[in-house]
A protein has these predicted regions:
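P-loop NTPase catalytic phosphate-binding loop
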Residues: 1-111, 120-184
Length: 184
């Protein structure tokens, strides 16, 4: 921009983001660039990606080889998407239990404590970015999964989960409750 580089920080500005635009507007390329920049700035020990691509896998295929990419799911295997969302819910439950056992209110506090004293404080788990290209198609194909995604979005800030949803038309696909947690 005219004032210099634009920075989007999911921790400071998020926790979640909505990328919207018509066909050919560059949504997928913007999302790819953003994820590549995150991978460039943070190690796989700091951030992991779960990529859900409802365009058959074409968008995120270039990111699959990154050590940050934990999973790439497509509309070609609908059962895998359901299992992945259930798995993410389990990960968040374990994080919540770990935070409680260690006495930290949220992942950011755990990260700060580890940074100050890496010998005494164990390393926190990586932040988890769930990026969904063609969110509307996912919502239509898996309407039951929207409840799980809503719960994940609500818990995301404190537990280190960040949802990035890309879609042509957010209305009808992204609920008001979910939008309330999407600050970017």
């Amino acid at each position: 921009g005219e004032e210099g580089p634009v920075n989007l920080d999911l921790v400071a500005d998020g926790p979640h983001a909505l990328v919207a635009g018509c066909t050919g507007s560059g949504k997928s390329e913007a999302l790819l660039g953003w994820l590549a920049a995150i991978a460039h700035c943070y190690s796989p020990e700091q951030v992991r990606f779960i990529l859900i691509d409802y365009k058959g896998g074409a968008t995120f295929a270039r990111l699959e080889a990154l050590p940050h990419t934990q999973a790439l799911l497509t509309d070609l295997d609908a059962g895998a998407t359901t299992r992945a969302l259930e798995g993410i819910a389990s990960i968040l439950q374990r994080r919540e239990e770990s935070l409680g056992a260690l006495g930290f209110p949220d992942l950011a506090a755990w990260e700060s404590a580890h940074e100050e004293d890496p010998v005494s404080v164990s390393a926190p788990p990586p932040r988890l970015i769930v990026a969904i290209d063609e969110f509307r198609v996912l919502a239509q194909a898996h309407p039951d999964s929207m409840e799980v995604l809503l719960r994940l979005a609500a818990q995301g800030r404190s537990l280190g989960l960040h949802l990035i949803a890309a879609t042509q038309r957010p209305s009808g696909a992204v609920s008001a409750q979910m939008r309330a947690n999407m600050d970017i």
